[in-house]
Amino acid sequence: MERTERPASRWIDLTRPLGEGIPVYPGDPLFQARPFAEHSTDGFRGTRWAFGSHTGTHLDAPFHYFVDGETLDSFPIDFFVGDAAVLDLRSTVGVDSERFAAPRSVGRPVLIEPSDLEPFESIFDAVPFVFLLVGWAERFGRADFYNAFPSLTPETADWLADFPKLRILGLETPSLVAFPTGDFSEADAVGPIRSFDAEFLPDAFPASPPFSPPETQGSAESGADESSVVADAELGAPLDEAEFCADAECHRILLGRRPPILLLEGLVSLERLPSFAPPSEPGERVEFDAAKAFETVVFPLLIERSDGCPARVAARLRADAADVER
């Protein structure tokens, strides 16, 4: 039997590296790394890591918002491999758009409405992974990274949920709906510490002081461990109620669809990939072009009962595909 030669290919990493000092979502635990063995004393090196399930480039599972939702470890491994496409929205709702400048001046996010995505219907019908490029990854580490980034609306989430082929929606942004400007301080941008289990943490790890959580937190119904919850003051300023409700609603719509749409947040280097640009004229549609699609792997760690997890994400391009540098 003759062997079929596969076309040459190359990989582009879409993952943000994890390490101490990486900014985290306000209220989430900092990434921490401490050696438990050293070359000089033990003859080998071993490291204890502590980090939240939604740190860096990560996937959200239905269990993130639904007590009976699927966990990441329940999905077959081939769920995380598929063809992907990038929608370049920088000029319409992203950092290069007129809409971005005006709302930012009053601290409100640009809203990504169904009408912004409707020209790309053919792409959503064609590939299981769709990534939205808005130019936000370049703002990582700035105090405004969580402020007013281009945000989905519940109506847009409903629109996306109607595409049966879609199984992973990828974003550069840290969530689906932004904090309004001014809702948290620059100190919060590097992440207040939420304590882990005392038995897990060595003395070298800082931990938040104990407290009595409100009745609405750590209840038996939610299954939350009260020792892992910290007071509001420990988490930085809370989301505005409207933004929190919109973020939760968008998550619930997409993660709650049957089958669910998983959410991949914190992507980088999307600008290096082939992409679909918006149409030049209102009312025009963008036709799917298979040459602009690419195979992608999105591999989270295999952790039992995971509501989310950092993931290694990589796109495989044909060797003759342009590596776009902008």
Which residue ranges define each predicted feature?
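Active-/binding-site microenvironments in catalytic and ligand-binding cores
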Residues: M1-R326
